[in-house]
């Protein structure tokens, strides 16, 4: 199942715990404003965090000229002619930008807390400390999907959203989670933005991701149940054939009364009806 990280982590599940600035405070505030404008264009779980930061200064946001996402690193964009870098330490190292020592970063990044850096041109200006949490309903549905044998593939522009983070927060195995690279992520966006031809709806939801997960899990369970019922019915037919053949060979067909046949059919009917319910 393909999902967007913004649906997996809706507003309120990613919380800003603190901001560490590097250099002057004015430069850090300017960098955060530029990053806020950039994330408003990009979207994703971090956009809600930056909306909280600049809630009173939305009219003062600078103009975004373009951006790219680097796999597992973060966003690099142009805002008012300046290069804004927003992402994990690996992104800054790849761009040869100095970042704090890993030991210093580890003081903030532990458990459900993660950090993300903001850089302007060639300088790191700020580090945001974020806490990620799992929505309870989404967590339950993801676990149910995993039990049904369905994996989840996430489209994200947030470098902190990794299979390991999703696995830890939602209580599922890392093997059940995948993350799209930038190329496939772009293809995903094209597909979801395309207009879908009109068709008869076999299932309808209100658009919530957990509702769609619930539907998919239910469909998988129904398919398994149908397969089990068919197997039980086949076993009943084979057993009936063997029993009749055995009685015919020994000339005991006269012992099959209407009551015995009725009870035999009633037994298998009870098995077919009750066993799927017990399985659930």
Write out the residue ranges for each language-model feature.
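ATP-binding catalytic core of ATPases
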Residues: 19-71, 94-95, 102-104
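Juxtamembrane helix-loop transition segments at the membrane interface in multi-pass membrane proteins
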Residues: 275-280
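Small-residue-enriched core segments of transmembrane alpha-helices in multipass membrane transport
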Residues: 255-270
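Cytosolic beta-strand hydrophobic patch enriched in CBS
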Residues: 2, 75, 114-120, 154-155
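Conserved ATP-binding TGD loop and adjacent catalytic N/P-domain core of P-type ATPases
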Residues: 79-81, 120-258
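Asp-based phosphoryl-transfer active-site loop
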Residues: 1-21
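ATP-binding glycine-rich phosphate-binding loop
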Residues: 66-74, 90, 107-111
């Amino acid at each position: 199942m393909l999902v967007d990280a913004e649906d997996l982590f809706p507003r309120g599940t990613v919380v800003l715990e603190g901001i560490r600035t590097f250099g002057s405070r004015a430069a850090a505030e300017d960098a955060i404003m530029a990053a806020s404008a950039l994330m408003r264009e990009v979207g994703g779980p971090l956009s809600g965090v930056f909306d909280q930061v600049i809630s009173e200064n939305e009219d003062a946001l600078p103009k975004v000229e373009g951006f790219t996402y680097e796999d597992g690193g973060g966003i690099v964009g142009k805002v008012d002619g300046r290069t804004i870098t927003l992402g994990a330490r690996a992104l800054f190292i790849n761009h040869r930008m100095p970042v704090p020592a890993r030991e210093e970063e580890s003081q903030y990044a532990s458990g459900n807390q993660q950090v993300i850096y903001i850089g302007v041109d060639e300088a790191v200006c700020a580090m945001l400390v974020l806490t990620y949490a799992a929505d309870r309903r989404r967590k339950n549905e993801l676990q149910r999907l995993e039990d049904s044998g369905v994996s989840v593939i996430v489209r994200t522009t947030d470098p902190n959203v990794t299979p390991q983070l999703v696995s830890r927060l939602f209580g599922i195995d890392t093997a059940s989670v995948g993350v799209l690279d930038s190329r496939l992520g772009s293809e995903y966006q094209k597909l979801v933005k395309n207009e879908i031809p009109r068709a008869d709806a076999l299932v309808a939801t209100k658009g919530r991701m957990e509702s769609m997960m619930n539907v998919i899990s239910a469909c998988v369970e129904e398919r398994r149940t149908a397969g089990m019922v068919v197997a039980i019915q086949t076993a009943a037919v084979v057993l009936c054939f063997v029993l009749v053949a055995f009685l015919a060979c020994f000339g005991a067909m006269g012992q099959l009364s209407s009551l015995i046949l009725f009870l035999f059919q009633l037994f298998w009917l009870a098995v077919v009806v009750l066993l799927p319910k017990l399985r659930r």
